[in-house]
Each structure stands twice: as structure tokens, then as C-alpha cells.
Curated annotation (Swiss-Prot):
PANTHER family: ATP SYNTHASE, ATP SYNTHASE SUBUNIT BETA, MITOCHONDRIAL. One of its GO terms (molecular function) is ATP hydrolysis activity. GO terms for biological process: proton motive force-driven mitochondrial ATP synthesis. GO terms for cellular component: cyanelle thylakoid membrane; mitochondrion; proton-transporting ATP synthase complex. It is found in: Plastid, Cyanelle thylakoid membrane. It comes from Cyanophora paradoxa. NCBIfam families: atpD. It holds the Pfam family ATP-synt_ab_N. Keywords: ATP synthesis, ATP-binding, CF(1), Cyanelle, Hydrogen ion transport, Ion transport, Membrane, Nucleotide-binding, Plastid, Thylakoid, Translocase, Transport. This is ATP synthase subunit beta, cyanelle. It is an enzyme of class 7 (translocase). ATP binds at residues 162-169. It catalyses: ATP + H2O + 4 H(+)(in) = ADP + phosphate + 5 H(+)(out).
Amino acid sequence: MATTTSKTNTGYVTQVIGPVLDVSFPNGQLPKIYNAITVKGKNEAGQDITVTCEVQQLLGDNQVRAVSMSTTDGILRGMEVTDSGAAISVPVGTPTLGRIFNVLGEPVDELGAVVCDSTLPIHRPSPAFTQLETKSSIFETGIKVVDLLAPYRRGGKIGLFGGAGVGKTVLIMELINNIAKAHGGVSVFGGVGERTREGNDLYQEMKESKVIDENNLPASKVALVYGQMNEPPGARMRVALTALTMAEYFRDVNNQDVLLFIDNIFRFVQAGSEVSALLGRMPSAVGYQPTLGTEMGSLQERITSTTKGSITSIQAVYVPADDLTDPAPATTFAHLDATTVLSRNLAAKGIYPAVDPLDSTSTMLQPGIVGEKHYACAQRVKGILQRYKELQDIISILGLDELSEDDRLAVARARRVERFLSQPFFVAEVFTGSPGKYVSLEDTIKGFTMILDGELDELPEQSFYLVGDIQEAISKGQKLLAEAK
């Protein structure tokens, strides 16, 4: 959806190399860098072709080099190319909710055109220093393990690490649900270079869990933007900017708190690397593009809190060959405020969300930001879980009875803490049958402090499993004790 100017410049294709086109324009009528140009014509089979490209280089001799946003199959030399006079622009605002878009802002869910008053270009400057929110504040998610041990920063960036099948999608959907209910905010999901099947699964699950309301789309809580694995690298490189532009509108114009999901940030870097090679740039370390830091920075710096609203971004991070020193994840880490690590061991135990309490980190967990009470409680929880982890080998070889009295007590409380870190989700009600729970930070701290102080040692472990606040655990425990008599 590129806007057109009254005077259109027209050129013609001189060379096609995969997703990269060279186009010749009349003297003095060259398009600017990042302008959208459109190739229109018929292929050899007589079918209409419309391909939008983005200008990346001005080569001299009235030639420009552009990267295609869709397949270049059927494009022939000599085909007419029109300069739109502006960057790729996408629809923004409430009409985007509940819909799926491609990189150009065109709906791809077969639900008809999007009627939208305003569009915005995907290339925009990051907010000025004077517009930024200077105070660090916590973004409460209502998920106990996250809020207590690795709290999110309002307007911050969070890395989400986890393999297949440990609950990334369910956690993402719960966060989308909770921001809508607790903060009156909306979410934008950017699917960058991931599997089309996963994108379809996510869409279907969102409809099932009512995150997307099919009967009343504007009441949905999320807009989806997909540029999947089968797309050319130009689309995968720019789809994150399309999603971010939609999120910026909700922040700057609607003054809302927005969650922006990027799955997967590594694919954004990978697509940039492919485009860089196609444009003939000299590769940098490990074959990545020399502009890696600049590209990542221009995306990440737009994700921030302003005085009007905030964009909090949760980015799934794929670590190639589990090598954290690889330039792609290493560049990403420099921008992150918190990490949420999902553990297969916890998922195997049935503890959901399977967030690893010891591996997950946050720069917000400081007494000056979260307060002494929260900080002390979090450190005690981490301490007792670390002690339990250290004793695991002894327990598995010799059994619990061989431990000292103090260690046995620590293990008993750690097992209660571990179970209390689990929580029923609203979006999982469809599968589990148990109603979801949103737990305030105050209730979370109170609950864990009571367990650590030994006030609930008489309750069975099972009473802390998949409950909301501590009162629910106490009621469940008393019921279990009454049944056991």
C-alpha cells in the first residue's frame, strides 16, 4: 500500500537476479532510497504481475537497485516500473485488530479489504529524547514467576528463549490476553521468517481462546503481521518494521500500552544477511552483514516508552547451534532488559508456565526499582531453589532421609515454591478446564513470603499446584486435608 504522488516517475527493468532488480529511470527522476517502486506487466503465460520492491542503492547512470517484497517469478527485462514517491505504507489503528497482514499491509486472511482512515510509512525515526519516559517502571503481567523473579520493564525488550513444545505460544497468548484486560492495551504479533504452519496454528488458537473475536473483529486484542519462511528475504527483513509501525500508532495516537511480539528476531538478522549479500556488500564476522548493528539498532530504538504510552517488546530468540557468542544473538542481547527462559525439565514435571526461575533474568530486579520487599522475596525464592537444585544429586542417590533436618525443610519449602510458581492460564481454559488466574504483584510477594516463612508447612505440596493467589492454595490445602481424614 504505497501512496502515489501526482507526478509519477516511470522506468524499466534492466536486470533481475533472484529477489534483486536493477531499474533504469529517466535522467533526474531517480527514486529516493527506501521508496516503494512497483513492477507491473504480464508474464509469458499472460497473467498479470504486480510486484512491489524497495529501493536500496543508487548505482549511477540513472540505475537503482531494489529488493523485492514478493517473488520475482515471471518478471522480464523491459517491464515498466513505477515510483510511488514514498516508502512502503501500511494501515494502522483499530481496523487492523483481528486481521492478518503481509509486509505491505495487505490483508491475507481472506476476510476482505481493510477500511482504514490512516496509513503510516514503515521507515520512521525513533522518538526524540524529549519524548521518552525517564522513570523505570515495572510492567505487571499477572504471571507470578515473571513478575516476581524476572519482571518486565514498561517499554522494555524481553528475550524469550525456549525449544519446541515448552509453551512459548501459550505464554505469548496469555500475555496478549492479560495486557488487554489489565492495561486496556493491545498487541501486535510479527511473525518473522517462521513456519507458515506455526503461523496458522497460532491464528486458530487465538480464535479458540477468544484473543481474536471472529464475530466482532474490532474487539480483538491483537493484529498479526506475517512474513514467513517461504517469503523472499526482502519481506522477512521488513515485516518486523510493518508490525512495529502498527504498534507505534497505538502508542502515539491512541496513547495505549502495546505489546509487540517478534517471532523470531534471529530471522530478521538472517534476512538482512541474505539481502546484504545480494546487494554485493562485503560480509562481516561469520558471514553476517556489515550493517548488522545499525539494522538491529534502528529497529530496537523505536521500541520504547514515551510520555504518551509504551511499546513493550517480547522477542523470541533462536540461538544458532546454541552459540551465544554468534553475532546475531550477541547483538540482540545488547538491547534486552530481561530474559524469560523456558525449561524442558519444568514442562516435563507439568509445571506451567515452564519459566526457569534461576536462568531467567531482569535488569529491573534491583531494590531501587522494585523496592526492598520485592527484591528480598525474589532473592529468598532464588536462594531456596538453588539449594534444592544442589541437593538433587544427593536425593536421587541416597534419598531424602539422608539429608540434615535443615536441608529436608529447605527441600520441602522449595518444592512448595516450585509448585506455587505454576499458574492456570485464561487462554488454556479450553484445554485444561480450570479457570485462568491473574495474580497481582502484591499477592505474589505475600504468597511466597508465607511459604518461605514456614507458615504453610502443614499444607500438602499438591495444594500449591496450578493455583492463583495464596488464599486459593490455602483453601485447596484445607480441602485436601479434610478429604484425607
